[in-house]
C-alpha cells in the first residue's frame, strides 16, 4: 500500500509540473501571441486559412454555434459513410465488411461527440482506413472543438461590451495545429519506442508453444490513434481491450505516460483560465476543488480494490485482481480508472465490470457529477464554470446580493443557460436508463442479474449521457435499441450544453465589469472551494442517489453474508 501511495503522489506532482508550462503555452495560443513553434507553424496556419477561405472576423454565439454544428454534421456523415463502405475502401488487408446502419450511426455519433463509446471490437470490425482516416481524424477535431468553445467562454468573461466570442474556424485550426498535433506526435513516438504497434502490415499468423496451434496477431496504426485518444480525452481503443491490451499499453511506464496524457490538457486548461482572467488564484481555486474530489475518488477506489477482495487465511493478497493486468496491479488500475472517468476519457486498462461494488461506484459517480472533475478537454472546464456560476448564485441568494463572477453580474438569462449546461446530462442519463431497463433487448444484453445487472445498464447510459465512453464489459452494447438511443443521447449531451455555453459567453461578453466591493463574494478562498465542492457533489447526489441505491450500493450490501 505504501508503494501505491508513493505512486499516486508522484503522479499528481508530475502532472502539475507538466501542466503549468503547457497552460501558459495554451494561453498564448488562445490570444494569438507568438510561441516557440510559430516560426514553423505560422506559414502552415496562413496557408490553411487561405485554402479553406477562412475569415478571421469575430462571430456571434449563434454563428459560432452554427459553425460547430455544421462542421460536426459533416464529420458525422463522413465517418458514417466510411464505416458502412469500408469493404470497398483501401487499407483493409483483413477484408473487413461495412458496419450495419445502427452500429455505424452509433459509432459516428460517438466519435463526433468526443464520447468514443464502442459497441464493436476494433481488430475484428474495422479496417486500417476506418481507424486512421475516419476515427483518428475525429479524435483530433472533436477535442479541438471542445477547447475552441472553452476559448469562447473565457472570452465572454474577459471581454467587455462585445457582440462576438471569437472565430470558430480560427480557434479550431490553432488548437489542432499548435496544441494537439505537436503533443500527439511526441506521445506517439514515445509509445512506439516502448513497443506500441504502428504498422499498416497484414495481421501476423504465429505458431504458439501449445500444440503448435496457429494464432492471428492483430496489428495496425495504433500508436498514432492512442496518442490523441488519451490527449483529447476521447478514449476509444484501437483494440477491443483498449489500454489493457499489451499492444496499446505494454508496461507500467506506458501506463504512467497514458494516465498523464489523459489529465494533462484538462489540468493545463485550468492553469490557462487563471492566466486569461489575469488572476491565477481563480485558476488555483478551481484546480484545488477538482483535485480534492479526484484524490478522494482515487483513495476510495484503491482502498476498495486493495482490501475488499477475497481473502484466504494464511495466504498473502495483492488485492482484488479480477479483471486487472498483473503488470499494472491494483494501484495502476485504480488510478487509471479514476483518471479516465474524471476526465471524460473512457479508456480502460482494467475491466470496470470486475471492480468491487464500491470500486465501481466511484468511476460511475465521477461521470454523474457531469464530467467536471477535470472533465473532457474544454467541455470539463466550461461545465465547471457553470457550477461556479450556480454556486455564486446560491451564495448571492443567501446574503441577498446580486451574484457576480469575475466582475460580471449573473442575470436570469445566464442561469437559464447554466441550467441547460448542468441538467441536460443527468436528465438524458436517467431517462435513457429508465427506458432501457424496460426493453427486452437490453435485458438480454446484461450478463449479470440483480443489482449488478442494473449497475451495468446504469453505467452504460451514464457513460453515453456524459460523453465518457467507458463501460461495464458485461453489457452487450451492439443492439439496435442501444445503438440508436445511445447515439441520440451522446449527440444531445454534447451539443446542448455546448450551445448553452456559447450563448452564456456572448451574454457575458456584452456586459461591462463591475468593481468588486466589500460585499462581493470571493471566489478564490477556501470557503468558496468548499461551497463549490458541496454544490457539485450535492447536484450529483440528488440526481443519482436513488439509482445508485438500486445499483452499486445494493450490490455492495449483497457481499455481506
UniProtKB/Swiss-Prot annotation:
InterPro entries: KdpA. GO terms for biological process: potassium ion transmembrane transport. It comes from the Bacteria. It is found in: Cell membrane. One of its GO terms (cellular component) is plasma membrane. The chain crosses the membrane at residues 4-24, 65-85, 133-153, 177-197, 253-273, 285-305, 380-400, 417-437, 484-504, 528-548. Keywords: Cell membrane, Ion transport, Membrane, Potassium, Potassium transport, Transmembrane, Transmembrane helix, Transport. Signal peptide: none annotated. It is a multi-pass membrane protein. GO terms for molecular function: P-type potassium transmembrane transporter activity; potassium ion binding. Disulfide bonds: none annotated. NCBIfam families: kdpA (TIGR00680). Belongs to the KdpA family. The system is composed of three essential subunits: KdpA, KdpB and KdpC. Part of the high-affinity ATP-driven potassium transport (or Kdp) system, which catalyzes the hydrolysis of ATP coupled with the electrogenic transport of potassium into the cytoplasm. This subunit binds the extracellular potassium ions and delivers the ions to the membrane domain of KdpB through an intramembrane tunnel. HAMAP family: KdpA. This is Potassium-transporting ATPase potassium-binding subunit. The lineage of its organism: Bacteria, Bacillati, Bacillota, Bacilli, Bacillales. The gene is kdpA.
